[in-house]
């Protein structure tokens, strides 16, 4: 689960990390009051969306008067911001963070991620702050320094000092960086994070380190024990179909194709998407209904797929092991009757109670295309999506 920048900075402040004073504003009136409270002659206005690349998209701007604040709010508040990390629709801007301006001498990068291969939290630093860190890793990997954390002892000051040396920090900056590093390590564990990022971590004109940006991603599997963070969830930033699928314990990821896919098992779902693409089709989604599904969940899965207006055909690929094919068939029939499907539906059933499942579909009187194999299913659904 992603947090907004202003929410992440609230967490940073709880751990004593240096962040700028600011206010998340949901109206122009709140923004005018915020800049008066912050004081100074200039501020930074930041659109709050769950996506990077805000600056390049115009969603972060230095404003020097109340009139410029007004202009920024009229342009972005209530609109959708499109960045290189969003789809063509962009993300809704429901709040704009007004922040005190900082005098920056140098920009650095500091981040941490849960590395599943090494089963450790890994910190990363670079002297190339304020830019896309993926580009740094690809083009100049020698400028990206990593530090794995022993889970038994956590982030240690000596590790922070070692990274500080690699960043070229001097004097009191080294001690300050070590403190920031240790607090971030503590935060990562206590808050069940999967990623945190400060890009940029800056050196101010007074030579102090400062967290100019803040990004936090919380492990969704741990939200049950993080009520404070769970309360910060912003459903408006999530795909409505993915949110609906989560309520029914369905694994759904929206894509940009026109062939809806409903499969049981993540591996089979990925294989199904591959074979659809192999035959010239474009999947509209990844959807794994799971091994212990019910006909009600199948019906909801159908509704979620059909809520995507770009879907021109649907492929149902079920290998019955734990899940029975007759239950899937009953769910398909119920969903088609309830929703009223106007697009072709191709179904391939194999395994547990597959003959019974096929019989249920055949006797339903619905216009369902039966496939004899996975290859046949892929060919038929691609042709159906193309209107052949």
From Swiss-Prot:
Binding site for Mg(2+): 199, 213
Cofactor: Mg(2+)
Free-text remark on how the cofactor is bound: Binds 1 Mg(2+) ion per subunit.
Catalysis performed (reactions): succinate + ATP + CoA = succinyl-CoA + ADP + phosphate; GTP + succinate + CoA = succinyl-CoA + GDP + phosphate
Function (record text): Succinyl-CoA synthetase functions in the citric acid cycle (TCA), coupling the hydrolysis of succinyl-CoA to the synthesis of either ATP or GTP and thus represents the only step of substrate-level phosphorylation in the TCA. The beta subunit provides nucleotide specificity of the enzyme and binds the substrate succinate, while the binding sites for coenzyme A and phosphate are found in the alpha subunit.
Complexes and interactors: Heterotetramer of two alpha and two beta subunits.
Protein name per Swiss-Prot or TrEMBL: Succinate--CoA ligase [ADP-forming] subunit beta
Originating species: Mannheimia succiniciproducens (strain KCTC 0769BP / MBEL55E)
